[in-house]
A protein has these predicted regions:
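A Rossmann-like FAD-binding core segment of flavoenzymes
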Residues: 70-107, 111-114, 176-275, 320, ...
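FAD-binding core/adjacent interface of flavoenzyme oxidoreductases
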Residues: 1-12, 27-28, 32, 40, ...
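Glycine/Thr-rich phosphate-binding loops of Rossmann-like dinucleotide-binding domains
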Residues: 42, 127-128, 170, 192, ...
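FAD-site-proximal beta/loop scaffold in flavoenzymes
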Residues: 6, 132-153, 244-303, 311-318
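Beta1-alpha1 glycine-rich phosphate/pyrophosphate-binding loop at the start
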Residues: 3, 7-79, 169-196
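A conserved FAD-binding loop/helix module that cradles the flavin
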Residues: 169-171, 292-338
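Short, well-ordered coil/turn residues at beta-beta hairpins
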Residues: 120-122, 127, 162, 251-252, ...
């Protein structure tokens, strides 16, 4: 199928949810494409933590993020779904002709006609929160890093982690045995990280393998073309210290933006898209799945994103062809996989 022919389902987002949506579309015999602003499939997993282990994916005691993406991409693309990477969706229009009409998704350089849409955009376009101090841009990728793509780059380094969430605490654990020393500072004494990981870091501190300080923030960065020292400040006592540091890794969350999707008339709750029990939005023909969605009891997990992708795609297929059952049956009995029905 030509890349710009009318497709049954266009999926916005190439992370785990979008990849599983593409797989399910193919399994249901629907033509599909994935459009993503990032240059590679995998979403946040590849953009932010390809070398981190994930422990809560069914069937894997643990799996590296990059390996999960590799396998999900192989699964997703086996039925001919096309990928359009580095493409930011800038517009949407409706063409009311033919069998009930269709949508056209527009990017800066292309147009993609589609019968239905599944938005699996995660948190949307994202940018790491900066420290907000003078001159930090001078040291970016020269001792100041806002993500960890390869932990080996910190081998033998004196590392300062900044933050109180899962990423900061996870790397305080995962850089053990790699970094020469690890200090983790946070501006408060409460943490958003998982309690088990917080306990791990406290235990590492008791063993002298990590230093955890609360109520401390980065005040200034120092160096000559490359980061050499950091001044930190205690917000309670106003004490300051200047430390010899090789790498500062602020893990303070992200600014996110759904971009043009916000202009489509979709019902939203804060930055999330409201969906019903079949993952349908308030706009007929547009579904959503994964972290971008909001509904009562919503959990933002890879596992739930996969389930939501199934629900969205099966209902999209049914909306295109009302004779198609919503429930696809069991994949173990499907001829499409080379199996014959019993």
């Amino acid at each position: 199928m030509a890349e710009h022919e009318l497709r049954d389902i266009s999926i916005i987002g190439g992370g785990p949810t979008g990849l599983f949506a593409a797989f399910y579309a193919g399994m249901r015999g629907a033509s599909a494409r994935i459009i993503d602003a990032l240059p590679a499939l995998g979403g946040q997993l590849m953009a932010l933590y390809p070398e981190k282990y994930i422990f809560d994916v069914a069937g894997f005691p643990k799996v590296l993020a990059k390996d999960l993406v590799r396998d999900m991409a192989a699964q997703a693309l086996q039925f001919g779904a096309t990928t359009h990477l580095g493409e930011v969706v800038t517009g949407l229009r409706r063409v009311d002709e033919g069998d009930g009409g269709h949508f056209v998704l527009e990017t800066a350089s292309d147009s993609f006609p589609t019968r239905t849409i599944v938005i699996a955009a995660g948190i949307g376009a994202f940018e790491a929160r900066r420290l907000g101090i003078e001159g930090e841009e001078l040291y970016e990728e020269k001792g100041l890093y806002f993500k960890v793509l390869d932990p080996r780059q910190f081998e033998g380094k004196r590392v300062l982690l900044v933050g109180g969430g899962d990423s900061a605490f996870d790397w305080a654990v995962n850089l053990q045995g790699i970094a020469r020393s690890i200090m983790l500072i946070h501006r408060r004494d409460g943490f958003r990280a998982h309690a088990a990981t917080v306990n791990q870091v406290h235990e590492l501190q008791r063993c002298g393998q990590c230093e955890l300080r609360t109520f401390w923030e980065v005040k200034a960065l120092h160096g000559n073309g490359r980061l050499e020292r950091v001044t930190i400040r205690n917000s309670k006592t106003k004490d300051e210290e200047t430390l010899d540091i090789d790498a500062v890794i602020p893990l303070l969350g992200f600014h996110s933006d759904l971009g043009a999707i916000k202009e489509w008339g979709l019902d939203t709750e804060k930055a999330d898209i409201k969906v019903d029990q079949v993952m349908a939005t308030n706009v007929p023909g547009i579904y959503a799945a994964g972290d971008v969605t909001s509904y009562p009891g919503k959990l933002k997990l890879i596992a739930t994103g996969a389930a939501e992708a199934c629900i969205a795609v099966n209902n999209a297929v049914h909306s295109i062809n009302p004779k198609a059952k919503v429930n696809p049956g069991h994949s173990s009995n499907m001829a499409i996989f080379g199996q014959k029905d019993d």
